[in-house]
Amino acid sequence: MSLNRSEKEAVINEVTSLAAKAQTLVIAEYRGITVADMTKLRVEARSKGVSLSVLKNTLARRAVAGSQFDVVADQMTGPLIYGFSEDAVAAAKVVADFAKTNDKLVIRGGAFAGKALDVNGVKQLANIPTKEVLLAQLCGLLMSPISRTAVVLGALAAKKGEGEPAAA
């Protein structure tokens, strides 16, 4: 079904607004994926804050023109699904995890911070922990010296308490 000019402009505007808010774009070929599998992928993506879209490549190229994702315009050929995410690693994680279990989804590439990513770049990005996990790890690192100091002081107080005679 072809779109008329106003519908195409609406699609371009919607994708342009997605691209403006997103940090990451992942592009994957979905040839041969069943509707049920595609639905699972979309549900998983939605739960992680990733917007997945199947777009005409010419409309996608126009939508990302002039944005940080313009660097992947040459990769936009064939039946592709586009994953935009505001979280730096969410789109890469969702698509890479799904591609591990479904060999019909083939990662083509993507873009992050104005740089084009190849397949390995997307997979490396997917291996980075999420922002929340990194913050939790940082808090753990910051709390570790404090808790160690408290344990040492507690042991020192217990040791000093053992050496003194009990009050009568």
Swiss-Prot record:
Question: Which Cys pairs are S-S linked?
Answer: none
Q: Name one GO biological process term.
A: translation
| Keywords in alphabetical order | Ribonucleoprotein, Ribosomal protein, RNA-binding, rRNA-binding
Q: Name one GO cellular component term.
A: large ribosomal subunit
- Parts forming coiled coils: none
Transmembrane portions of the chain:
none
Instruction: Give the matching HAMAP family.
Output: Ribosomal_uL10 (MF_00362)
What subunit structure does UniProt give? Part of the ribosomal stalk of the 50S ribosomal subunit. The N-terminus interacts with L11 and the large rRNA to form the base of the stalk. The C-terminus forms an elongated spine to which L12 dimers bind in a sequential fashion forming a multimeric L10(L12)X complex.
* Protein name according to UniProt: Large ribosomal subunit protein uL10
Specify the species.
Acidovorax ebreus (strain TPSY) (Diaphorobacter sp. (strain TPSY))
Task: List the taxonomic lineage.
Answer: Bacteria, Pseudomonadati, Pseudomonadota, Betaproteobacteria, Burkholderiales
User: Gene that codes for this?
Assistant: rplJ
